[in-house]
Amino acid sequence: MRKNPIRRLAALALCLAIAVSLTACGKTEPPVEATATPQPTATPVPTATPEMTAAPQPTAETPAETPAETPAEGDAITRYMETMTLREKVGQLFFVRPDALDPAQSPGEINSSETVGVKTLTEEMRSVLTAYPVGGVAIFGKNISDPETLRAFTSDLSGAVRVPMFLGVDEEGGLVARLANNAAFSLPKYESAAAVGASGDSAAAEDMGRTIGAYLAEYGFCVDFAPVADVYTNPANTVIGSRAFSTDAYTAAQMAGACARGLASQGVLPVYKHFPGHGDTAEDSHNGLAVTYKTHDELAACEWIPYSTNDLTGCAVMVGHIAAPNLTGDLTPASLSGTMITTYLRGELGFSGLVITDSMAMHGVTDAYSAGDAAVAALNAGVDVILMPEILSEAFDGVVAAVESGAVSEARLNESVYRVLQYKQLCGIFAP
């Protein structure tokens, strides 16, 4: 049964009131010097990097030790987890397209933006959910026709499994806005995050987040894959562009924090993206592996500023399919890298919240990994939620088999399940 939406909004707003701000309650950085914002400059691509090797295939030998909270013995979530089957636990780690629940669709059809999307929950889809009780569904433009159909769809999805689902959408404002850019919806539209950032007014960014969060909550969503926290510094970059708030790290951080605060005020979980930084890459991870050749110090001084200067309590972070060979020594995507997730995001930056991959159907992963191997590698790297695997059954069953064989420890599984349930409780959609 769905919780009262007002209670859900109030609960998350209260829990996140301390989150995501540079000026109010986040760590305060020195103000940016009053100089002109530099134009984007490309990072030179080296012809060879001596330490660089091909990305290793995932193995069971080096599971990440994620520095997260240990589930307290006897607490309500732990007691609830004791009643869950292995498949129910594994299901909490998967956030899928609704089309992945339609047995009539091929992987190509599921992951294409050109095919007709499912817009209602059918009995066949309910049967798939019985076998694959996923923890979340991400709605795309092709799954949206009109307001009433969408409300019915999100309501049906939420109650279709034992543990209510996260319902998420990409609603950044501007180019990427699945609801606002649909002509059937009379919703506020924004030119772009870049236009908001150029105003220099963080209140405008917070108002954008608040406005978007309000209408997302109205349509049953509790997760927004926003804000874009990337710093746009490479003019050759075609995937981020105006989706970023600024070419300046501190401005991007301030605006992303304000936008996230606005989303949270409406009971919508903000997801900062795309760690370790997609604004300086030349490649689009939809089409292949993106690579940043920056050093640790260069990333810390630019791309990581939105993560290090904002209080991310109660927020989620999306990790991209971006290799950082000068930090890892190879071309493993950050989404599958224990070094990037456990050592840097969780360790150095101190993030103990929900970590989500970017879509695992992107060529940045699928060109080198099977759906099952990618899911296992991500989990062992410290990821909590696997977003949109290329083939749900292969990824899901791959994780189940890995847990049964010990390739993924039960402790590693339980850690992420616990965190997912904590966040669902925070969102007001789950009560153990």
Locations of regions flagged by a protein language model:
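C-terminal motif of bacterial Sec signal peptides marking the signal peptidase cleavage site
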Residues: 20-24
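N-terminal hydrophobic targeting/anchoring segments and the immediately downstream early-domain regions
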Residues: 26-29, 33, 39-167, 171-181
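Substrate-binding cleft of extracellular glycoside hydrolase catalytic domains
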Residues: 163-209
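Second-shell residues forming the walls of enzyme active-site clefts
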Residues: 82-85, 109-117, 121, 145-165, ...
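A substrate-binding/cap region within the structured catalytic cores of diverse enzymes
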Residues: 191-260, 264
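Mid-to-C-terminal alpha-helical segments outside catalytic/metal-binding sites
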Residues: 404-432
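Hydrophobic faces of well-ordered beta-strands that scaffold small-molecule active sites
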Residues: 90-98, 135-139, 165-171, 223-227, ...
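Bacterial N-terminal signal peptides that target proteins for export
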Residues: 2-13
